[in-house]
Swiss-Prot record:
Gene3D superfamilies: Glutamyl-tRNA reductase, N-terminal domain, NAD(P)-binding Rossmann-like Domain. Homodimer. Belongs to the glutamyl-tRNA reductase family. The gene is hemA. It catalyses: (S)-4-amino-5-oxopentanoate + tRNA(Glu) + NADP(+) = L-glutamyl-tRNA(Glu) + NADPH + H(+). Catalyzes the NADPH-dependent reduction of glutamyl-tRNA(Glu) to glutamate 1-semialdehyde (GSA). Keywords: NADP, Oxidoreductase, Porphyrin biosynthesis. This is Glutamyl-tRNA reductase. It comes from the Bacteria. It is an enzyme of class 1 (oxidoreductase). NCBIfam families: hemA. PANTHER family: GLUTAMYL-TRNA REDUCTASE.
């Protein structure tokens, strides 16, 4: 069984490509079924395992399979599922086998692979991915163990290093950008579209600047109202967005929509109604909520999640000592996991040996019972039984020694000598 991680992230692909391979939450379970099916068949020795992690910054497929062509099969599946030409997708995809897959999972959960170094949101996102895969029946021994250790390593890294200290979050970066456009956020009206965790973080940071007005527009009215009331704001229906957009100086959007909810025409009308006063817009969604053409309008300052990443990275350099500590912890834990994985690889062999030995035992016991039933001497039957079992049990090792090449025979002799030295002990 081999572990494999296939994916793209903010290091390897722009948001324009990442949004095309994102998985909406409701699509993940059925996607897992079709993903696993590429390895199901008469040649599969064990059931494949899979999990899908899809966030603003990454789409990753975690797999455990005995298919030697797993890498190519997984990339081709991702291409077909999202109707993307393989030539367009493949250059941006990373494929990480075995220890590389383990190391990657540990680094992702610890915040070392995030756009915001040390951010904690990814842990919750990974736990959601694991929960969804478990509910879909897609997890097994290997991925369960991988993710259990992943979360333990993330906890160890965050509790023993300063990896998350003084980090600049995406929400804080959005405020900094707004302050470059407007002298004071306190003089501006702010609209948040969505009511998820990222919008909640952004609302917290913007509310600290005491804007003139804070408004939340959300598809679910109750959730939008609840979030707005936390910050002494108000909520409006999402359906009113086109007619109310011109009222706001700052617009931050992050929904789970698979299609843009703010089009070029709506923003053009808003700019005209505002008499060309600037609008600062932040699109943190993947797939994007705001049509990218909006950024070409003269009076609109549109930033995506990738744009904010440049500001976030400014604060990453000061925490390189913590990164080195975290990497050392992760490397040790990777070696520990690989030792467990190596031990697991022996289990099928041991199970097969037990099965074969039991088949031989049953056959010889059945033969001995027939001999006893016809009146043969019990002592002679026991002697025949023991000789038959001895001959059959040593037939395999003897045959292997006889067939071994000269360069392998010495190694086999040494291994078997040590084996029979221990297994032949009569100590009680």
């Amino acid at each position: 069984m081999q572990l494999l991680t296939i994916g793209i992230n903010h290091h390897t692909a722009p948001v324009a490509l990442r949004e095309r391979v994102a998985f909406p939450l409701e699509q993940i379970k059925p996607a897992l079924d079709t993903f696993k099916s590429i390895w199901l068949g008469p040649s599969a020795r064990t059931a494949p395992e899979a999990a899908i992690l899809s966030t603003c910054n990454r789409t990753e497929l975690y797999c455990a399979t005995d298919d030697q062509a797993a890498r190519e099969a997984a990339i081709q599946w991702l291409s077909r599922y999202h109707n993307l030409p393989i030539g367009e997708l493949a250059p941006h995809v990373y494929a990480l086998p075995q220890s590389e897959a383990v190391r990657h999972a540990f680094r992702v959960a610890s915040g070392l692979d995030s756009m915001v170094l040390g951010e904690t949101q990814i842990v919750g996102q990974m736990k959601d991915a694991v929960r969804t895969a478990s509910e879909a029946g897609a997890l097994g021994t290997y991925l369960n163990q991988l993710f259990q250790r992943t979360f333990a390593v993330a906890k160890e890294v965050r509790s023993t290093t300063e990896i998350g200290a003084q980090s600049v979050s995406m929400a804080a970066a959005a405020v900094r950008l707004a302050q470059r456009i407007f002298d004071k956020v306190a003089n501006q009206r702010v609209l948040f579209i969505g009511a998820g965790e990222m919008i909640e973080l952004c609302a917290t940071h913007f509310a600290a600047q005491q804007p003139k007005e804070l408004v939340v527009a959300n598809r679910t009215a109750e959730r939008g109202t609840r979030l707005a009331e936390r910050f002494n704001g108000r909520a409006i229906p999402l359906s009113e967005l086109p007619s109310r957009m011109h009222e706001f100086d700052i617009i931050v959007s992050c929904t789970a929509s698979t299609l843009p909810i703010i089009g070029l025409g709506a923003v053009e009308r808003a700019v005209k109604a505002r008499r060309h006063r600037p609008i600062f817009m932040v699109d943190l969604a993947v797939p994007r909520d705001i049509e990218p053409e909006v950024g070409q309008l003269e009076d609109v300052f549109l930033y995506t999640v990738d744009d904010l990443g440049a500001i976030v990275r400014e604060g990453n350099a000061s925490r390189q000592a913590a990164v080195a500590q975290a990497e050392a912890i992760i490397e040790t834990r990777v070696q520990n996991f690989m030792q467990w994985l190596d031990a697991r690889s022996i289990v099928p062999v041991i199970r097969h040996m037990h099965t074969q030995a039991d088949v031989l035992r049953r056959a010889e016991v059945e033969r001995a019972q027939k001999m006893l039933a016809r009146g043969d001497d019990p002592a002679a039957v026991l002697e025949a039984l023991s000789q038959a079992l001895t001959n059959k049990l040593i037939h395999g090792p003897t045959h292997a020694l006889n067939r071994a090449s000269s360069e392998n025979r010495d190694t086999l002799i040494e291994l078997m000598s040590g084996f029979y030295k221990h297994s032949g002990s009569t100590e009680r």
